[in-house]
Structures are given as C-alpha cells and as structure tokens.
C-alpha cells in the first residue's frame, strides 16, 4: 500500500480518446490496485456517467466535476475543485494507490497543476492530422507520456505514422510516447508499464 495515492492526469483535445483510455486503465488495473477516478466536464458529468455505465469501477469510486466554461482552469490555475474531489476520494477509500484525473476537453496549451498531478499523460489522435505533433504546445512537448491514439484511422485520413513518429521524437526531445488503438488495446500495456515504473507503483 502506498502512503499517498499516485495521481495521474490524463489530458488532451475533445474526442482524442481520454475517456476510452481511462476506462481501459480502470478495467486493467482495478484488480491490482486500490483505484479511483476524477473526471472533468464543462457542464455535465457525461464522462463520469460513461465510466459508471461501462462498469469501470464501483460508482462511488468515480467523481464527476463540472468545471464551467474553462476546463483548463480547473486543472491548472485553480485546481481547488479537483483537489477537493481527490481529498473526498482519499477520505472515502483510505489506502488508495492510484487516482486518475481526466481533464475536460482542452487545447494544446493546457497543463496540469503539479499540486494536482504527479504524472501527466497527454492524448492526441491521428484523425486530427499528422501535422499535430509538430504544432507543439505543453501537452505534446512536456507531458510525461504522450499517447498518439486511433492509429487505425491513419489510412482513412491520409496520415503518415512515420512522419508523426519522427516529428514527435524531435518535439519531445527523448521523452516517451506511445502509439495506441484503444479499440484493440494496442499500446495499453506500454502505458500501464510507464505508469507503474514512473509512479513507483507496487501492486497489493
């Protein structure tokens, strides 16, 4: 059991696959770790409801936060609403190992406050085009792990994974990244290995 839970922030643009990744991580890790989730949505609790419907975790382990019009503010400049949700989960489930904090759909400049997140995973998707990595921004360049999702769509949108690979290496300067397809689970094992290694997680 870890003294304080590892908090992993999962960010990225709307539709990139953040919630699908959060669901996949819950299903893969819930037997190994004492786990909970905070989701951020602008005006609803849609992502939290999705996780509950798909039985990611018991409903009481998932808190949906409504951020209002600026989802990036709730994870960066004023993270108090998220920190309160994390505190609530810690009180509800003593001995938590891991809390996933999924941001609302944000732009390429959004980052997590260090107060809120120990590790950050930023999710982009191939359907946004193969030029996306070279556009940079803190999420692409500075996140602890970049996930390039929906690689199955590359042929459909004319995106070059080779170009994305070389651009991402250049933009991230050696920081890790993973190509993934959440529909098939491709890349998930690498993402989990990163979380466990970097977060010093030890299963109960």
UniProtKB/Swiss-Prot annotation:
Gene Ontology terms: biological process: urea catabolic process
InterPro entries from the UniProt entry: CobW/HypB/UreG_nucleotide-bd, P-loop_NTPase, UreG
Gene3D superfamilies to which the protein is assigned, alphabetical: P-loop containing nucleotide triphosphate hydrolases
A GO CC term assigned to this protein in UniProt: cytoplasm
Residue sites binding GTP per the record: 12-19
Entry superkingdom: Bacteria
One Pfam family here: cobW
SUPFAM superfamilies reported for this sequence: P-loop containing nucleoside triphosphate hydrolases
GO molecular function, one term: GTP binding
Location in the cell: Cytoplasm
Family: Belongs to the SIMIBI class G3E GTPase family. UreG subfamily.
Role of this protein: Facilitates the functional incorporation of the urease nickel metallocenter. This process requires GTP hydrolysis, probably effectuated by UreG.
Assembly notes: Homodimer. UreD, UreF and UreG form a complex that acts as a GTP-hydrolysis-dependent molecular chaperone, activating the urease apoprotein by helping to assemble the nickel containing metallocenter of UreC. The UreE protein probably delivers the nickel.
HAMAP family named among the record's database cross-references: UreG (MF_01389)
Protein name, entry field: Urease accessory protein UreG
Organism of provenance: Pseudomonas fluorescens (strain ATCC BAA-477 / NRRL B-23932 / Pf-5)
């Amino acid at each position: 059991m870890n003294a304080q839970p590892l908090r992993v922030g999962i960010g990225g643009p709307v539709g990139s696959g953040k919630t699908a990744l959060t669901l996949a991580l819950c299903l893969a890790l819930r037997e190994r770790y004492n786990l909970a989730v905070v989701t951020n949505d602008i005006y609803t609790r849609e992502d939290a409801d999705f996780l509950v419907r798909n039985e990611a975790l018991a409903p009481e382990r998932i808190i949906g936060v409504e951020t209002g019009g600026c989802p990036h503010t709730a994870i960066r400049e004023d993270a108090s609403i998220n920190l309160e949700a994390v505190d609530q989960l810690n009180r509800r489930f003593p001995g938590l190992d891991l809390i996933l904090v999924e941001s609302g759909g944000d732009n390429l400049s959004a980052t997590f406050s260090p107060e809120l997140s120990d590790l950050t995973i930023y999710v982009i998707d191939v359907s946004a085009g193969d030029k996306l990595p070279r556009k940079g921004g803190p999420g692409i360049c500075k996140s602890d792990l970049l996930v390039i999702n929906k690689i199955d769509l590359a042929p459909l949108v004319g995106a070059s994974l080779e170009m994305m690979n070389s651009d991402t290496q250049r933009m991230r300067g050696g920081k890790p990244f993973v190509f993934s397809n959440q529909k098939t689970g491709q890349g998930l094992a690498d993402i989990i290995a990163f979380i466990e290694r970097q977060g010093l997680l030890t299963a109960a």
